[in-house]
Amino acid sequence: MKTTVKLSFMMFIEWFIWGAWFVPLWLWLNKSGFTAGEIGWSYACTAIAAILSPILVGSLTDRFFSAQKVLAVLMFVGAVLMYFAAQQTTFSGFFPLLLAYSLTYMPTIALTNSIAFANVPDVERDFPRIRVMGTIGWIVSGLVCGFLPQMMGYSDISPTNIPLLIAAGSSVLLGIFAFMLPDTPPKSTGKLDLKVMLGLDALILLRDKNFLVFFFCSFLFAMPL
């Protein structure tokens, strides 16, 4: 299998996983009797994890571990956490598991990008084609967990825990597939300190007006997520 095909499949499953549970989650939580505030806190898990994940995973991966191996481990652990989260019926049982799951998933977004960047011959030419498969994966997850089952004569699965189980199963699939990805060894060898772990050394990039505009637009774009 060609490297670009492997990377495209990786990106497809990566975003399929998130779309499978994230979009229909509120339907299941509402049906299970969760309050509006509890549903809001559940959706906040990914945002909290996105803030913490660079500290917990990003800096360590850059220096000590191959990206594809970390991806595999995080996917396997995430699959277990998502499976048990899908069995919960109370907020006190569900929220900690979803938060823990989010802490394993959110770092994989950067990991898959790093793996793709490191293993394509021409980033400007090849990466957009690979990354668009992630968008397609998100769309397909909406079809699979949305109206497609009803079109095939089955009952609606969106207000059930099945989308979460689909996400768990897809995580196992990507965890296994990660061992087939090209080796992406750590590149950074610099000193690891709190400033680096928090990403504060990257703030110097904000001096570039073009990057500042990009940063601000990305911030606004990510708010609904």
Placement of each model-derived feature along the sequence:
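Helix-loop boundary and gating motifs at the non-cytosolic
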Residues: 1-48, 210-225
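Helix-to-loop junctions at the C-terminal end of transmembrane segments
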Residues: 52-66, 149-153
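Hydrophobic core of transmembrane alpha-helices in multi-pass small-molecule transporters
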Residues: 12, 81-82, 91-111, 115, ...
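Symmetry-related core transmembrane helices of the 12-TM Major Facilitator Superfamily/SLC fold
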Residues: 161-179
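Transmembrane alpha-helix termini and helix-breaking/packing motifs in multi-pass membrane transporters
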Residues: 140-166
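Residue-level signature of mid-helix packing/kink "hotspots" within the transmembrane helices
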Residues: 47-55, 139, 143
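Structural signature of the two symmetry-related core transmembrane helices
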Residues: 69-83
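Juxtamembrane intracellular "pre-TM" segments in multi-pass secondary transporters
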Residues: 1, 181-216
